[in-house]
Structure formats: C-alpha cells, structure tokens
UniProtKB/Swiss-Prot annotation:
It comes from the Eukaryota. The keyword Secreted applies. The keyword Transmembrane does not apply. Its main location: secreted. It comes from Hydrolagus colliei. It is found in: Secreted. One of its GO terms (cellular component) is extracellular region. Belongs to the glucagon family. InterPro entries: Glucagon_GIP_secretin_VIP (IPR000532). Keywords: Secreted. One of its GO terms (molecular function) is hormone activity. This is Glucagon-like peptide. The lineage of its organism: Eukaryota, Metazoa, Chordata, Craniata, Vertebrata.
Length: 38
C-alpha cells in the first residue's frame, strides 16, 4: 500500500529533520556558552 509507506517516510523524515535541527541548536548553544567563557 503506497500511501502507508509514503506517510511513514514523511513522518520519519520529519523526525530526522527535527532531531537534526535540535542537534544544530544544541551545538549553537554550546558555542555561545564557550564564547561567553573566553
């Protein structure tokens, strides 16, 4: 059933993008903390 596969693909892609964005914002936050320390 193509629709089911497509939906799950979109869901996993969304999760992937969300986690990627989370990791990016986390590393940006860490960078800011390090800058403040210097």
């Amino acid at each position: 059933h193509a629709d089911g596969i497509y939906t799950s693909d979109v869901a996993s892609l969304t999760d992937y993008l969300k986690s990627k964005r989370f990791v990016e914002s986390l590393s940006n936050y860490n960078k800011r903390q390090n800058d403040r320390r210097m």
